[in-house]
């Protein structure tokens, strides 16, 4: 990652999975990062645009450092970034965050409970930290 | 289409970058959970690229409706390219126009404007589901089995029961319907019973001659629901 790339916002791309709460957490964590924790230093784009092969979206993931947030092991966000010719500098799995929250009731794919928001905030904080390190030129080992 | 395709597939765009994407996603969820729980299934759009053959065959095995946030129509494009022609395609920005201007991307702190936009789109999706099912005209009693590509989210939500003319009637998602009525400030008295009936009729078939009985039963159940909510506070 060169210096020019480091000046660009890091793209945070969630899977937004529609079937389970994990997908909603990935999405809301992204909004927490891009809207609150690291506005201006991070941005998001529509994963569906990558699925479509939109030229601007494809160019964006190739030209920017990317962090993907996936709800399940199918890792759709990470895989679609890679299929578009980009690379996820860090690929986060929401399910990993659940390991620290045994017994939590996070809500469902439509809405988050307080437990769900707490997990989303933890994921968001991790993403913001990684984005900061990426912009500083330190690429995180996956 | 096989008999297994009696359920309509709904594919929503992810639309992370725009509020219409969030509306698309949440309206789709509402149809799956509440409006047409027994008639719909879904699949994550990105799975068409990242998934396996069963997932890519989704639109070949289900009549499918795509819900897109904007006129780029990524869900429609992705579904048709990787899975097959769709039976219907809705675009939230066309449906809502400027009504989505003040909507938010995050569901956190959703305003009344957000909620009404989601309901409006959900009702349009439900109507499209009905149209597709009517067009498909599957044989009566054909299998309602699930597909290998179906998400776990498509399980029906628990309903509520009413006693109408001495008969117990189950209404899918009744607690959620009541929750919505509370949000819309529908009063739990005779003045609100007509609005209550109108809302429930969206989700449950009520014949004109049954309306009076349903109105009384719904009002009583709604009053119980409100009392329960107040006791929780």
Report residues per predicted region.
Chain A
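Iron-sulfur-associated redox domains of electron-transfer enzymes in respiratory
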Residues: 1-142
